[in-house]
Amino acid sequence: MALPDFTMHQLLEAGVHFGHQTHRWNPKMIRYIYGQRNNIHIIDLAQTVPLLHQALKLVSDTVARGGRILFVGTKRQASDIIADAANRSAQYYVNARWLGGMLTNWKTISNSIHRLRKLDKILATETQGFTKKERLNLERDREKLNRALGGIKDMGSVPDLIFIIDTNKENIAIQEAKRLGIPVIAIIDTNCNPDNVDHPIPGNDDASRAISLYCDLFARAALDGIARQQGAMGIDLGAQADAPVKPILENTIPVSE
């Protein structure tokens, strides 16, 4: 395998360059903004490309050393994509609600995970001794725990690196990571504060196509790390064809500092 490749055309096709309306911006993002068009900020993809590449390499290197990556994205349009990317790259995820203390109070979280495992075992092997109502209550408890913790059930400890979609929504996760010294890679839209994360990647954090592209790239980077760790360099994940796109940045008004 090799580190996943991508092109400027893919970023444009996915709408990575589209930020928020100009009145909904964070001034700290000025250095990553190319200009504005129809009152929408346009993100400077010339900066996104190298930062994304560096982040992908960091993910691959971390996994190659045996590290764990936690994918975090709880917004509606990111939830399923985040889970799929983590599952197919043998990593971990939080895609429902971030529970306070998920990192900083790992002992309590571990107890809840133990409860989830116990419920899995009970419902798989010991169903005869329960009434229909008791079984239904157990299933509801398991469903609730699995929704919150299913993606980190097998993580074993806090992650070595975190990848986040939407830093505004996942602010608590970022704060907890900072307290523990866990590096954070994050997609930062034009309404975000890039200073809050260790490895910011300027880009649209709302469009499903953009989120799918990011998650696919990071999943493949993790798989590359696994392949490097195991010495199995012959895995073929397939190549993504580049779709032609029309020039989109024409008539864009530059933004000056």
From Swiss-Prot:
One of its GO terms (biological process) is translation. The keyword Ribonucleoprotein applies. Keywords: Ribonucleoprotein, Ribosomal protein. Pfam families: Ribosomal_S2. HAMAP family: Ribosomal_uS2_B. PANTHER family: 30S RIBOSOMAL PROTEIN S2 PROKARYOTIC AND ORGANELLAR, SMALL RIBOSOMAL SUBUNIT PROTEIN US2M. Belongs to the universal ribosomal protein uS2 family. This is Small ribosomal subunit protein uS2. It comes from Bartonella quintana (strain Toulouse). The lineage of its organism: Bacteria, Pseudomonadati, Pseudomonadota, Alphaproteobacteria, Hyphomicrobiales.
